[in-house]
Amino acid sequence: MIAYDLSEPAVVSRLEQLGPRLKILIDDSGDHGHADSGETQATQRLRISAGPANVKRQHMGQLQHNKTIVVEGPKVKMAVCGSTNYTWRGFFVQANNAVVLRGKNAIKPFVVGFDQYWSTETPAKFANTASAAWTSLGLDGINAMVAFSPHSEANPVLKFIADDIGTKTTSSLFYSLAFLYQTPGVMLDAIKKVSDDNKVFVYGISDRKVGGLDLQKPDGNVSPVFPSALGKKLPEPFKSEPVGGSGNRMHHKFLVVDFNKPTARVYLGSYNFSDTADTKNGENLLLIRNRRIAVSYMIEALRLVDHYHFRVSQQEAKSTRTRLQLAIPPRLPGKAAWWSKYYTNPLKIRDRE
């Protein structure tokens, strides 16, 4: 197991029950390394239950940011990865995702990757291992690969993804990426580039570093959604939702490209699509070329983005002193209907489709 955040008591208690069958890497960067942190307390407990030799702390070049569990037994062979940290916030507050992979072939890259992390302390050494390259998960009927960070600057995965988005997106791009607008670089440039193409429908959301969210509308404009607007006029229990801090609402890290095409694909994992995630942190990143799976992530992106798009519309209506209400059909002959732009404007056509 590899844990970035590890402070949920129910998780730690279950790990204790495994005894010496557990082998775990726990991040010790920043606050995680403090004597009173949840991660340090978990380390102390697990060293007693699993044995000191089975519990290790590390942070690679900056963070050991993986969130992976591998079960390798006579009956169960399973790996869990994604964006979900082992905390109360990760499970019950944030928008997160996790992927469960089953089978001997599927878990093998995770077993090898764990061993490489365990024996390697520096980004430069890990970047030269096979785990830093794309590796097939060997799933029947599904083209899926995984790569672990850190990568070398000579072989960055981030540029591979940016090139894919910037030059090969033909229909649509949906994204839900924590901190996108706080991590400028080739990924943000690629998203901006494809957003300028009126033949491509782009819809996305990103958590803001200082509270709230950034929402990208299909017209390419990015609108901030602030915490005050998110909580205003909400009923309980939503009104008392925890606020403050970064990544508090939206913690996903995924991109969906051309979900409605045979070439549909989705990138997902713990990987934040930044230079730091690419060349410094310990991360997992999956590339799945499967339309059904891509559609499932597109629906999650649409669920989030459409909800907050309505909040943006509320803010815009207030600032322009216009009434936000349902439109009615035209009453006079020759007057354009409210829906006519969805058949004439290229972006609106994509939206309708």
Q: For each predicted feature, which ranges?
A:
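Beta-propeller domains
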Residues: 132-204, 210-211
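PLD/PLD-like phosphodiesterase catalytic module centered on the HKD motif
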Residues: 12-92, 100-107, 118-119, 171-172, ...
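Glycine-rich anion-binding loop/nest that anchors nucleotide
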Residues: 3, 177-178, 254, 270
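Domain-level detector for secreted/extracellular nuclease and nuclease-toxin modules, and
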Residues: 4, 177-179, 346-350
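N-terminal carbohydrate-binding/catalytic regions of secreted carbohydrate-active enzymes
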Residues: 1-11
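Short linear motifs in intrinsically disordered/low-complexity regions
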Residues: 6, 29, 37, 141-144, ...
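Active-site beta-strand/loop signature of hydrolases that rely on acidic residues for catalysis
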Residues: 2-3, 26-27, 173-177
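Aromatic-Pro/Gly-enriched surface loop or interdomain linker
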Residues: 93-97, 101-161
